[in-house]
Amino acid sequence: MRATFVAGFLSLLAVGLSPAAYSSEPHRLSNAVIDAELRQREIAAQLAPIKSRDDLQRYQTTTPASANPLSKLSPAGRQRFLDSLVFNDRGELAGFRYGDLEAELSVSEIYRIMSLFGAQHTTSLMTKAKVVNKADRAIRAAPSLAAKGDYDGYSCVSRANCYQTPQYICMSGC
């Protein structure tokens, strides 16, 4: 009886330690992490107040400067950023120029701006932004899968067509 129990235990142990058992667990975990990130992005996009040029115009005219995170940019930097925005037909931000954001703003200020478009996950790609407070450090330290599907150094020039351009991000919705 005891020998049967030991043999059964050892066979279960051998199966539990097999490479197949280990290789499937990280795969499941990574899929769960990716799925969670994609759900977060969908929620952010749905809640974003700006999904088109019309939304942007409406936001700019109805939001007081004191409540508008875009007001943190210099007038020239704001204009370059706004002119660079590309939206797709699904109401998603598909690409933008981030050079002025990175040069003029802190990490949390960039996060607030990108939240207007449901694209706050791209903040982690702007590695030269200033870190000046606890919020900046928290955002910088947060894990992100921003690089998955978003291409730093490329601009969205047409549907599903990214072109190599410094200080631009071509997003998965291009």
Q: Could you tell me what each predicted segment is?
A:
Residues 20-146:
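N-terminal propeptides/leader regions of secreted preproproteins
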